């Protein structure tokens, strides 16, 4: 009996969930969506928050580096705004027509009888539009998005100080050691707290999950919480990445064991399409 139990445990798949970032992961950076998004963020900061245009590039870089997203950083340093208005302005004007259906990726995803979940810092509407444009809207069990981690009742109405913290000036000082940066009410990657919370909400076991993301910071955080990590968009493997793929189409090349187990069980779905061969570092 004990032998049978051990045998059954050995037959269990190594992974039972695939967790995917959305932007610049399920579609390539070359689409230009990220560039347009950065422009819209800058326009929002100038038009809606009254920030001088000349100060926006440096401010964006500092906020992104220290808070994960510019939005999270803006809230931290004292700007109060409606999250829906921000997302509508930043994402609502994106050229989604640049995204095209990806039948190769669709077949790769559908060929595996395993949980597949999207985890994005973006809002729900944006995620739905992207997945629909890619033809992947029915390939995932669910989407963990901005609203999942930041429900309106928890932080949208949180008031911040009327005084704006000058974070640019803070980092221009020769010695900022010991001076703590203001905290943000926004939960988002690469915060370990946010990522752990997301996994709890989705009932995902990090030890049995493969995490795909184009951000090296997110990959490092994913590794810290026990995820098996795959950096997407480059073949250069960075610290914290178990694998590195130039293209998401190379999932099978990086993790052949997923398909091998499915093929042995007879549950894999075959297609006449062949995935592109690009570089992978493991």
Task: List PLM regions with ranges.
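Conserved G/P- and acidic residue-centered "switch" motifs that form tight phosphate/ATP-binding loops
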Residues: 25, 120, 214
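Short phosphate-binding/catalytic loops that engage adenosine nucleotides
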Residues: 79, 114, 227
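Asp-based, Mg2+/Mn2+-dependent phosphohydrolase catalytic module
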Residues: 1-15, 110, 123-282
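Internal catalytic-core helix/loop-beta-alpha segment
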Residues: 103, 108-117
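N-terminal helical cap/lid subdomain that shapes the substrate entry/recognition surface
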Residues: 2-20, 25-106, 123-128
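Short, surface-exposed alpha-helical recognition segments that flank or form part
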Residues: 32, 96-100, 118, 182-190
């Amino acid at each position: 009996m004990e032998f049978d139990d051990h045998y059954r445990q050995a037959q269990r798949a190594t992974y039972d969930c695939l967790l995917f970032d959305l932007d610049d992961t399920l579609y390539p950076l070359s689409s230009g969506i990220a560039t347009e998004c950065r422009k819209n963020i800058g326009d929002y900061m100038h038009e809606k928050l009254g920030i001088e245009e000349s100060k926006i590039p440096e401010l964006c870089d500092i906020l992104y580096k220290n808070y994960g997203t510019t939005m999270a950083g803006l809230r931290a340093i004292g700007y109060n705004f409606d999250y829906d208005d921000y997302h509508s302005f930043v994402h609502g004007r994106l050229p989604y027509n640049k995204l095209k259906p990806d039948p190769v990726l669709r077949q790769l995803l559908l060929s595996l009888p395993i949980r597949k979940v999207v985890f994005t810092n973006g809002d729900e509407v944006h995620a739905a539009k992207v997945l629909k444009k890619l033809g992947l809207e029915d390939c995932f069990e669910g989407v963990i998005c901005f609203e999942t981690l930041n429900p309106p009742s928890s932080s949208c109405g949180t008031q911040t100080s009327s005084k704006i913290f000058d974070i640019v000036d803070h980092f221009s000082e020769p010695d900022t050691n010991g001076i703590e940066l203001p905290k943000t009410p926004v939960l988002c990657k690469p915060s370990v707290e946010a990522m752990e919370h997301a996994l709890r909400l989705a009932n995902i076991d990090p030890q049995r999950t493969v995490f795909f993301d184009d951000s090296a910071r997110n990959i490092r955080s994913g590794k810290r919480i026990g995820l098996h990590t795959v950096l997407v968009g480059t073949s250069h493997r960075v610290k914290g990445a178990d694998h590195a793929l130039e293209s998401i189409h190379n999932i099978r090349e990086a993790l052949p064991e997923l398909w091998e187990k499915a093929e042995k069980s007879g549950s894999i779905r075959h297609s006449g399409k062949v995935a592109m061969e690009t570089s992978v570092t493991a």
